[in-house]
Each structure stands twice: as C-alpha cells, then as structure tokens.
C-alpha cells in the first residue's frame, strides 16, 4: 500500500457543486482534494455544454458553461485545492466512528486518501452518450461524429446534421444555425420533446428556408479516413443522401454511478438520499450535494448545489474541528475572511 494523502475532505466530483464546496470549506480553513474521472474541472458544464448559455445563475443574466467554471476556479484559487483528474474512486473504507468519522479512499490510479469527511458531488455519476445503431460510426467519432458540442468553431461553415427531438438537439440546432453552412435536423417523427419556444423557433427557420427538417432515421454514413461527406436517411419515401460534414446525435445519456453504489448509502433510483439541514447521508461524515442527491422538493439546478454545499460545510466543520466553536461570518464585513480571500 502506498503512502496515503492526508486531507480534511475528499470531494468526489469537480463540477460546479464540488468547486463551490471548496470555496465554502476554504472560508472555514478546511482543506480539500478533488477527484474526478474527467480530464479537467467543470463536470457536465465543461464536458457537455461548455459554450451553451445558462440563464438561471444568480447575478449572471447569461453565462456559458465554461465561463461559469472559469469563474468558480478563480473564486477558489485562494484556497489552493488539489485536483486529481482522470481517476475514479474505486473503494471506500470507513475507519472512524459516527461521532468521529474518518475514511480511506482508493482511486483507479492507485492513489490513497485519508480524510475526516467525504463529499460526493458526482453529478449524475459518469455520463456516457447513447450511440445510434449505425454500422461503422466509431470510425468517424472525434473527427466528424460528436456526442456533445464542446467548441462551436468546429462547426463553422460545415454541413451539420443534428439527430434528436429533445432539448439538446433543438438548442444546438438554434445555436449552431448562425455559423454552420447548413443545418439539417433529423428526427424520427414530427413531434418534439423540447421546449415549445425552441420548437417554434426551429419551425420558423425551416419555413424561411434557413435550415432543413427531415423525418426518418440515419441508417449509414458516407466518407473516408474519419471525415464524413454524407449520411443516408431512411424515411417513409425511401432512402436519401444528405450532405454532412459533422454529425451530432443526441440520443440521451446513460448514467453509471460506479463504485459509489456499493458504499451503503441507501440509494433511491441511483440517487443518494440526504437530510436538508446539512446534506449528510445515512453514513456519518459522508455528504452528497448537487444532482447526485435526492430529498423532498429537490430541484436539479446548479444554484441548488451551491446552497447545499454551503450548508454541508457548516457540519463538516464540526467533524474537522470538533473542539472549535464556529462563529458565522459574512465575507462583506469579516476582515479574517477577506484576508483568506486576499482582498485586504
């Protein structure tokens, strides 16, 4: 067994909820290490929709996923968190007691952590795209076939075919329309699950001749060396080729919770039940914040994860500093907090 990394808190997941938890913990002099299976911070915001606008973050009329992540990283910089990317938590050992919990965490990369608290901020777990059943599609992935839009510039002046009928398909149809050479939206029927205003906007573009809507299913691909030239659509009137340089199938995501499912956390439909006072699980010292948790009235919003992290930090302090009284302070008026943030 290698030498363990000793820290106050291990945070599983470096999405917005996990990042903001670092801030709230840092204000209380609590050190943290973050572990994430992705290669960079930001979770779904950075991995699935870095350039997609978000409209319900307080104080930001509009901010895209990557901008939000960048701002969170700047906000937590004074607390010098340590990140461990490309790793999954494989095993958790409970070492302490309910009154004085402690844990040993093992990762897929062979690292070992010992901490007093574990905060699970893993979103929905590890998300993997559902792939369309098209023979040979793997040969075009990462060059011409994408399951998420990470850089809009990759689609500029291209013939883009988007497949799907939900919010992601419609949102990216509308967002990419101004820069793509031509957008074709493909859905198996003329009935969409997306927000009505998005569907109406799409239909207006189709009626004006600015994009195409085709009904049917993509059955094969044309191209070579990973570069698409066309897709074959099978509809009610037979098969037809559609010019295509970028194919974006939005068939949804599958969620894999992974080893967290074996931690004895009384899972409910792959979510972790918590109390709403401190967002602690049934295991003392293990907290869950963000989309991974569930409780009556839960809203899966980024701002909910921020709120949950702030309240969780108060209880975490009791575990990390059991003999130290916590006095609540405001960053607007506390000189000690401002000193931690480097603003005075």
From Swiss-Prot:
Q: What HAMAP family has UniProt attached to this entry?
A: FENR2
According to its UniProt record, which cofactors does this protein need? FAD
Reactions mediated catalytically? 2 reduced [2Fe-2S]-[ferredoxin] + NADP(+) + H(+) = 2 oxidized [2Fe-2S]-[ferredoxin] + NADPH
For this chain, the family text in UniProt reads:
Belongs to the ferredoxin--NADP reductase type 2 family.
Enzyme Commission number(s) of this protein: 1.18.1.2
Give the note describing cofactor binding and stoichiometry.
Binds 1 FAD per subunit.
Q: What is the lineage of its organism?
A: Bacteria, Pseudomonadati, Pseudomonadota, Alphaproteobacteria, Hyphomicrobiales
Q: GO molecular function of the protein, one example?
A: flavin adenine dinucleotide binding
The residues that hold FAD are 36, 44, 49, 89, 127, 291, 332
Quote the subunit structure annotation. Answer: Homodimer.
Species name: Beijerinckia indica subsp. indica (strain ATCC 9039 / DSM 1715 / NCIMB 8712)
Quote the InterPro entries the UniProt record gives. FAD/NAD-bd_sf (IPR036188), FAD/NAD-binding_dom (IPR023753), Fd--NADP_Rdtase_type_2 (IPR022890), Ferredoxin-NADP_redctase_2 (IPR050097)
Show the SUPFAM superfamilies listed in the entry.
FAD/NAD(P)-binding domain
The answer, when asked if NADP is one of the entry's keywords, is yes
Q: Does the keyword NADP apply?
A: yes
* Chain segments annotated as coiled-coil in the UniProt record: none
Descriptive protein name? Ferredoxin--NADP reductase
Keyword annotations: FAD, Flavoprotein, NADP, Oxidoreductase
């Amino acid at each position: 067994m290698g030498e363990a990394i000793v820290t106050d808190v291990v945070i599983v997941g470096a999405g917005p909820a996990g990042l903001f938890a670092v801030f709230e913990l840092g204000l209380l002099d609590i050190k943290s290490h973050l572990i994430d299976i992705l290669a960079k911070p930001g979770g779904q915001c950075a991995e699935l929709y870095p350039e997609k606008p978000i409209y319900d973050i307080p104080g930001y009329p509009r901010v895209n996923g990557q901008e939000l992540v960048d701002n969170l990283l700047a906000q937590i910089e004074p607390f010098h968190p340590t990140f461990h990317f490309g790793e999954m938590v494989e095993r958790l050992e409970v070492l302490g007691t309910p009154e004085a919990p402690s844990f040993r965490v093992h990762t897929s990369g062979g690292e070992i952590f010992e901490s007093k608290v574990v905060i699970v901020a893993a979103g929905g777990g590890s998300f993997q795209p559902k792939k369309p059943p098209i023979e040979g599609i793997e040969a075009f992935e990462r060059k011409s076939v994408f399951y998420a839009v990470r850089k809009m510039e990759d689609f500029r002046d291209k013939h883009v075919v988007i497949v799907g009928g939900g919010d992601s398909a419609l949102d990216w149809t509308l967002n990419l329309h101004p820069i793509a050479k031509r957008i074709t939206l493909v859905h198996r029927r003329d009935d969409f699950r997306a927000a009505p205003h998005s569907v109406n906007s799409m239909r207006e573009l189709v009626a004006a001749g600015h994009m195409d809507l085709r009904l049917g299913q993509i059955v094969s691909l044309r191209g070579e060396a990973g570069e698409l030239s066309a897709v074959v659509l099978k509809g009610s009137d037979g098969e037809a080729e559609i010019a295509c340089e970028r194919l974006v199938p939005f068939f949804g995501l599958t969620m894999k919770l992974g080893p967290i499912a074996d931690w004895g956390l009384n899972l409910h439909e792959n979510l972790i039940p918590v109390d709403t006072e401190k967002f602690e699980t049934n295991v003392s010292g293990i907290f869950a914040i963000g989309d991974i948790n569930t409780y009556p009235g839960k809203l899966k919003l980024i701002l909910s994860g921020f709120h949950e992290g702030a309240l969780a930090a108060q209880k975490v302090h009791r575990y990390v500093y059991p003999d130290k009284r916590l006095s609540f302070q405001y960053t607007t008026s506390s000189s000690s907090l401002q000193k931690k943030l480097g603003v005075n």
